[in-house]
Design a protein with these regions (language model features):
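Acyl-donor binding region in acyl/amide transferases
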Residues: 77-151
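Glycine-rich phosphate/pyrophosphate-binding loop shared by adenosine-nucleotide-utilizing enzymes
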Residues: 63-68, 98
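Short, P/G- and charge-enriched loop/turn segments at secondary-structure junctions
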Residues: 41-46, 86-89
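Flexible, active-site-adjacent loop/turn segments at secondary-structure boundaries
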Residues: 3, 26, 46, 78, ...
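Short amphipathic alpha-helix that is part of the acyltransferase structural core
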Residues: 1-44, 57-65
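Short beta->alpha transition motifs characteristic of CBS
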Residues: 70-75
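Ordered hydrophobic segments in well-structured contexts
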Residues: 57, 68, 132-134
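A short helix-loop-beta-strand connector motif used in the catalytic cores of GNAT acetyltransferases and
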Residues: 45-56, 76-79
Length: 151
């Protein structure tokens, strides 16, 4: 099931939140080898999780995380403007452009989860009048984005 949850509401879904942040640690720190912090309970979280982002999350039948993405409007703080400004010609700031980061899949899920998350991104665009998403991603993701038609 696809869920749309703001960070302030994650406490209403403790298993989903717990498994999402653990899956993020597994994917970004251990599988991809990114320089991200993992806390004592095994969660990968950063300062952008404190800004009340909108998460699009695939919830498995047992209530656990299958996959997720994090969205923030570029009218506020974003990772791309604060950490990757060197690859831009200037800051991206528009109510019609949102940042999408932390695209994460649980190791055991099927391709339908990635496709559902892309559908969720389309629904975010429709429901919030978003025209574009911006994000910086690992080059290995290009193949996945092409498979699901999002490149």
């Amino acid at each position: 099931m696809l869920r749309y949850i703001y960070a302030t509401d994650l406490n209403d879904h403790p298993k989903l939140a717990r498994t999402m942040f653990r899956d993020r640690a597994d994917q970004f720190k251990f599988r991809l080898g990114w320089n991200v912090s993992v806390d004592d309970v095994g969660f990968e979280r950063d300062e952008y999780d404190e800004l009340n982002p909108l998460y699009v999350i695939w919830e498995e039948p047992d209530g656990s995380h299958g996959g997720s993405m994090r969205f923030l409007p570029t009218t506020g703080r974003t990772m791309v403007n604060e950490h990757f400004i060197n690859i831009l010609s200037g800051p991206i700031t528009s109510p019609f452009i949102w940042e999408c980061t932390r695209f994460c899949l649980n190791r055991g899920v099927g391709r339908h989860v990635a496709a559902a998350l892309m559908l969720g991104g389309g629904e975010v665009m429709q429901n919030f009048s978003v025209e574009h998403f911006v994000g910086v991603f690992d080059a290995r993701m290009i193949r996945i984005y092409r498979i699901i038609g999002a490149s």
